[in-house]
Swiss-Prot record:
Residues 87-110 are annotated as: Coil 2. This is Keratin, type II cytoskeletal 8. It comes from the Eukaryota. The gene is KRT8. InterPro entries: IF_rod_dom (IPR039008). The modification N6-acetyllysine is found at K53. GO terms for cellular component: cytoplasm; intermediate filament; nuclear matrix; nucleoplasm. Residues 13-25 are annotated as: Coil 1A.
Amino acid sequence: MSTSGPRAFSSRFASFIDKVRWSLLQQQKSNMDNMFESYINNLRDVDEAYMNKVELESRLEGLTDEINFLRQIHEEEIRSLDMDSIIAEVRHGDDLRRLALDIEIATYRK
């Protein structure tokens, strides 16, 4: 019986060690599952952030194009207004010269 005692103890101890190993493996698997799930969620967040970045860059490009277009139109309108102002000044100057000439002619006719 003395041999069966140590063998039985050894067998029970080996069984206990196997159970502990199995429990540790299950915990590791559970921890890895959580880790992979967290990793996948992080990848989804990164993907969403990248898609938002692409959308914002596209909107920025469109707004920049619109600003450049409006700036060009504004500059053309300013040039046109400047030309209109110059033309008005020339016409006003011509009108004043004609008026002065008419006054001078009227003065000589008297």
